[in-house]
Amino acid sequence: MAAQLQPYNIIETCHISPPKGTVASTTLPLTFFDAPWLSLPLADSLFFFSYQNSTESFLQDFVPNLKHSLSITLQHFFPYAGKLIIPPRPDPPYLHYNAGEDSLVFTVAESTETDFDQLKSDSPKDISVLHGVLPKLPPPHVSPEGIQMRPIMAMQVTIFPGAGICIGNSATHVVADGVTFSHFMKYWMSLTKSSGKDPATVLLPSLPIHSCRNIIKDPGEVAAGHLERFWSQNSAKHSSHVTPENMVRATFTLSRKQIDNLKSWVTEQSENQSPVSTFVVTLAFIWVSLIKTLVQDSETEAKDEVFHLMINVDCRNRLKYTQPIPQTYFGNCMAPGIVSVKKHDLLGEKCVMAASDAITARIKDMLSSDLLKTAPRWGQGVRKWVMSHYPTSIAGAPKLGLYDMDFGLGKPCKMEIVHIETGGSIAFSESRDGSNGVEIGIALEKKKMDVFDSLLQKGIKKFAT
């Protein structure tokens, strides 16, 4: 019997680093914003582009430019090419870029049998089908002294001959948040797209700032608590792709008209009659639909049970330091906020309004408070969230502009935030058609996905039409 054909053929695996001599060896400490991500899974994303050319054209015309522009981009975003260093306890982990040694693993692959249109479709598909276009982050190296060195990022570009290209990314979240990642991708994209043009005529995004870490002071041993949990959970365990069984992922889009109708309904039902934002009302609607899906098989009948949703607020330019943290700061700079709603409210007749009011109140509370003073209590809220039934969180945000990634091929025809499959996350982005709608990614068991889809359509009919 002939050997089964593998769906992807690895053409090349190479290492991309900043241009020689452009970046000195650099060590960056982890801040209390970084430490919570030490124990969490990788952040994975995929960008699909239409591309009608052959593999030969792809290798000759597109890949060399992509690699060259990535090298230049890493000159400014060099931590992505570095390592997460984990010394033996009690020394804290840190980021390090070793000039002339460190690099980012870059894989070039070709699809031999996978259907590009099916892979990028919105319809439910087994979560494992996307893993073939995700890069494999190399395993950590451990020195004789017990110092663990973990690669931070890997990239993969895969061609589907005559159909399209997928650019995939895997990275440890401890190095930076979605704001920084979006900044990195847009800088790389701008360089790639401008290849061959006069550099003086190319408008590039602002450069990232690395020097602010020394002013981000821990307001109350916040990082120490996360380090203790990291060490107790076995710091030698390396994050990797773990595929849950019987899971599918699907994408749903709420149009601008549907969102405006949702806003009107919530405003009319709310006691204070205050307008709500697109983000809040969309999140409220999706959270309600998701919880209604999940509780159908729940054994608990307690009406006073409380469900929790974790949101994140960008702290750039919001912290009361003597020097503000700029929008281009490279790193994590997000504050977690827990939204809590009782079961009978979240499943009741005015469920979307209840969720919307709770989310709005939590955001207002966070934006009006001194975030540094509340930071020592963030861990308590997160632990409450973790221990609850069906804890839900968010990945991505429409404001990140993840569909603005034009590498000279036009904007993506699809974008996926893959790591939502690890459980309980809702992926958010702007709609790809530019109509100011919102795109939502969900991962569930197949049976539950059918229920979610049905509830979502019923909700749209009730609240948004």
Swiss-Prot record:
The modification N-acetylmethionine is found at residue 1. It holds the Pfam family Transferase. Keywords: Acetylation, Acyltransferase, Transferase. It comes from the Eukaryota. GO terms for molecular function: acyltransferase activity, transferring groups other than amino-acyl groups. Its EC number is 2.3.1.-. InterPro entries: CAT-like_dom_sf (IPR023213), Plant_metabolite_acyltrans (IPR051504). Highly expressed in flowers, and leaves. Lower levels of expression in stems, roots and siliques. Disruption phenotype: No visible phenotype, probably due to the redundancy with 3AT1. The active site is at 173 (proton acceptor), 406 (proton acceptor). Involved in the acylation of the 6'' position of the 3-O-glucose residue of anthocyanin. Also able to use flavonol 3-glucosides as the acyl acceptor. Belongs to the plant acyltransferase family. PANTHER family: PTHR31625. This is Coumaroyl-CoA:anthocyanidin 3-O-glucoside-6''-O-coumaroyltransferase 2. It comes from Arabidopsis thaliana.
